[in-house]
């Protein structure tokens, strides 16, 4: 079977919100979330370093699994729990430096070919998306749906996986029934009428992850 070559993460990372500010990181940690990602796009390292550093410090205070999207140099510098990379970032990132620093690595995938590419890097977890149509970001690929997601899970076996893309409160349970280890959400929390209630309900379904 496939085995990660980066530091391990639990198979069940639980509810995995992806947010764009330190304010959201702090809110969600206080609400009981223990796996989350800071995703700030299209800024220079020096513009985001304070936010990255603050988010990592918060994650450490709560003993949480905080992943930094893309800014891998800053993640290494400030000793983050982990880094998350898109496919387009794999070729331009020093994966050996991330590994040597002891950081976990997550990689996005959208089809079988990208899963092959991710497996070659042997990251800590593989993100599978997008499951449903999403308004959060422009996607060149088509939604995979539950049947395709289940096929990927069967192929990957006990490799840690995260489903992402258009996962709402109503869709969370059907997604988890595919056998995927974790669910990543964005607008299900950040655009909810009551984000605290939405977070509590999603935590009740997906959990906060295994230790």
From Swiss-Prot:
GO terms for cellular component: cytoplasm. Disulfide bonds: none annotated. It is an enzyme of class 2 (transferase). It holds the Pfam family TMP-TENI. 4-amino-2-methyl-5-(diphosphooxymethyl)pyrimidine binds at residues 37-41, 69, 108, 137. GO terms for molecular function: magnesium ion binding; thiamine-phosphate diphosphorylase activity. Keywords: Magnesium, Metal-binding, Thiamine biosynthesis, Transferase. Pathway: Cofactor biosynthesis; thiamine diphosphate biosynthesis; thiamine phosphate from 4-amino-2-methyl-5-diphosphomethylpyrimidine and 4-methyl-5-(2-phosphoethyl)-thiazole: step 1/1. It catalyses: 2-[(2R,5Z)-2-carboxy-4-methylthiazol-5(2H)-ylidene]ethyl phosphate + 4-amino-2-methyl-5-(diphosphooxymethyl)pyrimidine + 2 H(+) = thiamine phosphate + CO2 + diphosphate; 2-(2-carboxy-4-methylthiazol-5-yl)ethyl phosphate + 4-amino-2-methyl-5-(diphosphooxymethyl)pyrimidine + 2 H(+) = thiamine phosphate + CO2 + diphosphate; 4-methyl-5-(2-phosphooxyethyl)-thiazole + 4-amino-2-methyl-5-(diphosphooxymethyl)pyrimidine + H(+) = thiamine phosphate + diphosphate. Its EC number is 2.5.1.3. Mg(2+) binds at residues 70, 89. Signal peptide: none annotated. Binds 1 Mg(2+) ion per subunit. 2-[(2R,5Z)-2-carboxy-4-methylthiazol-5(2H)-ylidene]ethyl phosphate binds at residues 134-136, 166, 186-187. GO terms for biological process: thiamine biosynthetic process; thiamine diphosphate biosynthetic process. NCBIfam families: PRK03512.1, thiE. Belongs to the thiamine-phosphate synthase family. Condenses 4-methyl-5-(beta-hydroxyethyl)thiazole monophosphate (THZ-P) and 2-methyl-4-amino-5-hydroxymethyl pyrimidine pyrophosphate (HMP-PP) to form thiamine monophosphate (TMP). This is Thiamine-phosphate synthase. It comes from Citrobacter koseri (strain ATCC BAA-895 / CDC 4225-83 / SGSC4696). The lineage of its organism: Bacteria, Pseudomonadati, Pseudomonadota, Gammaproteobacteria, Enterobacterales.
